[in-house]
């Protein structure tokens, strides 16, 4: 059972969820009477017609989103598959203007008798669009060429991993897009220069990470560039592409890279060299003009709460103490009693490092795949909803691996690409005892269950199943961390104390994130302080360029646990863990305040059943 302190902590979090996101839209506990539903047919149709059309127009703003979701079909999808999303400030303003218009139209539906699905859709759309509007004043606080999501790597990753390559038409679309890469990079460069003119520049250690990526991209000759070699690899067995046409496509791609793309990267390289002397070592966003307001907005965006940075910092310290006490007990059972938690975990890690002289990476990937298959079997009794799409484990590509974190990408809706759990394997040491918890988090029953199930939900509006309007990081990352805790609760680590310690270490890591993220951005922490606190260099640098996001994991998990505890307490024998999981996953990505209302309504329904 949860401790009194844990229950109090969760209650505090529950009380701080932003109620304004629903903006007067109350989610019903039971279906409306038939007469009311009949009278509401016209408004229902009006909302569906508007929301479907608005979502389509929103996707049209981002051709890359259209491709990753395959949102359209026929000629329109084919047209969008030939375009890259503009990266200009003007395009950003166009999106903000559209978001404002969307919120205005949603206001008009407040008084309409929408059904339950529509009310949830309206709440999710409103939350997402309001964030677009609220985030706009702080867009320049984010370094355009971030080592995690900047276009210098984002465009390459999209072209080599996401752009479909099924037939000759896709090859032609690839070349059309390739011809736009330099334009998009130049648009981003204009924005970066504008931000730099306002003293919005990254810390030196962040800039140098991005410089490394640009240098790495420019190192090979055009014919050996990843944008060319990937095209060659992906077309090698293409049935409707003749050898002559394939050779011509590769030659054209080589020419585009040489004549357009390499010069654009050289321009970015020169810009980075120009601002390098102006960079400093201060890590937090507070170093920038209006940085405190930017961080407050980031917390609201990523946690869906009104928690302050100080409150999050305190929650983190409390959770760290709780988890470390549990880890100490298990470490002592393995004979590791001397030193702090960090020292003893390093000693444990050393015991499980790969042995032998060969490259251990292929075997590690194979082990990850075995762990995912095992998790699928273990999850069978805990979930009614399961994804149809498979999930694969792959190593992060070389261009991004030096600074990448493990992550998950969705399967293609048409089945041409599985869900993918991407693992960075930099070496020379590897997180062997944390492999199971990472597999649960990123794949099964974590992100793959959550996101692939949502994509496959035929009873949701298309814009929700395809996550066109996000419900926020706290739901998605909170769920993934919740599944790590679930594995511990369900005894998946029975007879595997090192694996259990790896899982607890992962949870400790997320608790420390609360402390480190708020420390970096509001308490003057240096990069080295965060590293010394146990974050690691790559993770620390991620928090620097993505303020607030690290808070989503633990805050989201605590909220889901609080809601589960509430359901168990109020429903007693009527409570079902698989049914609770169905509820959390079945609505798709929603803000946590919306999830709270859904759980309350579900409890009311179950009591009446």
Where are the predicted features?
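Bacterial N-terminal signal peptides
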Residues: 12-26
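N-terminal maturation segment of proteins
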Residues: 32-609
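N-terminal secretory signal peptides that target proteins for export/translocation
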Residues: 1-7
């Amino acid at each position: 059972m949860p401790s009194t302190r844990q229950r109090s902590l969760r209650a505090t979090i529950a009380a701080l969820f932003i109620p304004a996101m629903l903006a007067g839209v109350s989610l019903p506990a039971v279906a409306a009477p038939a007469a009311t539903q009949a009278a509401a047919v016209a408004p229902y149709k009006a909302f569906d017609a508007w929301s479907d059309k608005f979502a389509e127009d929103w996707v049209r703003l981002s051709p890359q989103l259209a491709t990753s979701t395959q949102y359209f079909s026929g000629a329109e999808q084919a047209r969008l598959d030939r375009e890259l999303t503009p990266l200009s400030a003007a395009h950003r303003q166009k999106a903000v203007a559209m978001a404002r218009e969307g919120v205005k139209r949603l206001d008009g539906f407040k008084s309409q008798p929408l059904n339950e699905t529509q009310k949830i859709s309206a709440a999710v759309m409103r939350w997402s669009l309001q964030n677009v509007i609220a985030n706009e004043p702080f867009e320049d606080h984010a370094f355009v060429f971030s080592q995690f999501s900047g276009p210098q790597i984002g465009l390459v990753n999209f072209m080599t991993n996401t752009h479909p390559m099924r037939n000759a038409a896709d090859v032609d679309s690839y070349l059309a897009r390739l011809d736009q890469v330099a334009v998009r990079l130049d648009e981003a460069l204009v924005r970066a220069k504008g931000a730099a003119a306002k003293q919005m520049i990254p810390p030196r250690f962040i800039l140098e990470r991005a410089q490394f990526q640009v240098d790495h991209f420019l190192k090979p000759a055009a014919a050996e560039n990843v944008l060319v070699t990937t095209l060659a690899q992906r077309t090698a067995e293409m049935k409707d592409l003749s050898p002559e046409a394939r050779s011509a496509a590769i030659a054209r791609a080589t020419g585009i890279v040489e004549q357009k793309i390499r010069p654009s990267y050289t321009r970015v390289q020169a810009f980075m060299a120009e601002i390098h002397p102006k960079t400093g070592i201060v890590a937090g966003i507070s170093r920038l003009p209006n940085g405190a307001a930017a961080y407050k907005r980031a917390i609201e965006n990523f946690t869906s709460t009104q928690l302050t940075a100080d409150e999050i910092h305190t929650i983190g310290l409390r959770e760290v103490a709780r988890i470390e006490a549990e880890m100490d007990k298990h470490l002592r059972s393995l004979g590791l009693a001397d030193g702090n938690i960090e020292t003893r975990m390093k000693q444990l890690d050393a015991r499980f490092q790969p042995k032998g002289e060969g490259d251990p990476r292929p075997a590690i990937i194979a082990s990850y795949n075995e762990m995912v298959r095992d998790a699928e079997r273990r999850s069978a009794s805990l979930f009614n909803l399961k994804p149809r799409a498979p999930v694969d484990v792959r190593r992060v590509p070389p261009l991004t691996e030096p600074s990448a974190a493990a992550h998950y990408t969705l399967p293609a809706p048409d089945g041409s690409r599985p869900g993918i759990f991407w693992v960075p394997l930099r070496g020379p040491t590897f997180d062997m005892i944390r492999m199971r918890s990472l597999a649960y988090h990123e794949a099964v029953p974590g992100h793959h269950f959550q996101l692939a199930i949502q994509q496959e939900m035929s009873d949701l509006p298309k814009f929700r199943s395809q996550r066109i309007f996000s419900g926020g990081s706290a739901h998605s990352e909170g769920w993934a961390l919740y599944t790590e805790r679930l594995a511990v609760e369900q005894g998946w680590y029975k007879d595997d104390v090192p694996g259990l310690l790896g899982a607890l270490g992962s949870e400790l890591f997320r608790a420390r994130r609360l402390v480190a993220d708020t420390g970096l951005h509001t308490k003057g922490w240096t990069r080295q302080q965060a590293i010394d606190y146990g974050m690691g260099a790559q993770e620390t640098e991620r928090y620097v360029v993505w303020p607030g996001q690290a808070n989503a994991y633990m805050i989201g998990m605590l909220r889901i646990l609080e809601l589960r505890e509430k359901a168990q307490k109020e429903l007693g024998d009527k409570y079902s863990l698989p049914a609770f999981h169905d509820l959390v996953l079945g609505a798709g990505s929603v803000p946590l305040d919306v999830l709270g209302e859904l759980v309350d309504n579900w409890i009311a329904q179950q009591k009446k059943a």
